[in-house]
Amino acid sequence: MDNSDCRVPWASAPSSMTCLSLDPTKCHSSSSSSKCQPDCDTPPAAEKIQRHIAYTQRCPGKITTLLAVLLLVLPLSFTPAHSCGPGRGLGRRRERNLYPLVLKQTIPNLSEYTSGASGPLEGPIRRDSPKFKDLVPNYNRDILFRDDEGTGADRLMSKRCKEKLNVLAYSVMNEWPGVRLLVAESWDEDYQHGKESLHYEGRAVTIATSDRDQSKYGMLARLAVEAGFDWVSYVSRRHIYCSVKSDSSISSHVHGCFTPESTALLEGGVRKPLGELSIGDRVLSMTSNGQPVYSEVILFMDRNLKQMQNFVRLHTAGGAVLTVTPAHLVSVWQPERQELTFTFADRIEERQHVLVRNEETGELRPDQVIKVESVRSMGVVAPLTREGTIVVNSVAASCYAVINSQSLAHWGLAPMRLLSTLEAWLPAKDQLRSSKDHPKDSSAERQNGIHWYAEALYKIKDYVLPKSWRHD
């Protein structure tokens, strides 16, 4: 691909020039208010630069094409299945050499309570707490539980913690035959870990090996990372500390959503809360070239107005605020590489730039992120547009999540776009849309939960995509 195709007007043109506009015939310049005429003396290369914007086209190779085909075909033959194994990822062949952690190293290198790690504290769970019933006992025979209290408390943990611990136990037996995983501490009801600890919520475990061989602990920490723990710390020579996200936030890994009160701009110029959007509404989106365009909402990948959810909230210097689930893809402008990419929301940092709509000109321009915070709110809405993108609260974002490739995710939803097109051709559907007895938003109101196709894609992603391509 010609390198000029990937160049960006606001990076290559003078700083006063902007070419992201809903009206492609206009060129806005602070030095001149005149319009660019078709016969103006603009070199062909400059015209080409002005026609192409921001979004770096990644030509899919053979592997990407094969994965896209699998994403298209496998969901159509999807059927539910039950497994006797401890969880996802069990029994996989190790694909690369693993290196042990060093003392005091943590993965990820973030604070434990950030959304990119195990997430915020939700409060201690006591035996008389309503949340106590959410803790599950772990009777895995491949795990030794020290249980110093003699109450069985160390066997209690969150569902996600149990799943990851069982995967780790299997890995330990494969790595060191005859050695088992030792859990020294899990859920703690005696408050022996300071004021703030995920042990009080059943979301943390302190582990070692049954032979107490400290030379193994660096690799044990690495195996815990591979097992899927959200935060792992080689905190001491005597043990490893691991923690996970809360079970209530697991849905943020299944899908990507916005809050219902976030707004989208309709084609008529009216802002509408996402919770009130209807299938068929045309909302402001962004093309693959980075141009603003209005696109039809064809379905809701998730819609649940009563679900509590953890979100990442991004604040920009211009005053835009986007609230989105951690695994959602958001457009990020990379000035050092002069390209526009899509990044998981919980990996966006302060001083990075996102695309924000200018209210006066309608253009999409980079705006610096000045604050990133974790919040908890009620309700999730995930509209899917035909373009696969949507501008929410003036910030350009993807409609997709979990997979770190916008183009591959868009390929995966191609059957739904085709189905929507075929349905639009049916006369009966046109009659239903025009009838007052069948309001246009009835299908959205009936949906409560994840769309069946999106759920099918989530279930197969672990088998067709490398771990590095997924949000874990």
UniProtKB/Swiss-Prot annotation:
Stored Pfam families: HH_signal, Hint
Principal subcellular localization: nucleus
Residues where Ca(2+) 2 binds: E149, E185, D188, D190
Lipidation (N-palmitoyl cysteine): C84
GO terms for MF: calcium ion binding; cholesterol-protein transferase activity; morphogen activity; patched binding; peptidase activity
Organism from which the protein derives: Drosophila ananassae
UniProt protein name: Protein hedgehog
Listed EC numbers: 3.1.-.-
InterPro entries per record: Hedgehog, Hedgehog_Hint, Hedgehog_sig/DD-Pept_Zn-bd_sf, Hedgehog_Signaling, Hedgehog_signalling_dom, Hint_dom_C, Hint_dom_N, Hint_dom_sf
Subunit structure: Interacts with shf.
Residues under site feature: Essential for auto-cleavage: H328
Keywords: Autocatalytic cleavage, Calcium, Cell membrane, Cytoplasm, Developmental protein, Hydrolase, Lipoprotein, Membrane, Metal-binding, Morphogen, Nucleus, Palmitate, Protease, Segmentation polarity protein, Signal, Transferase
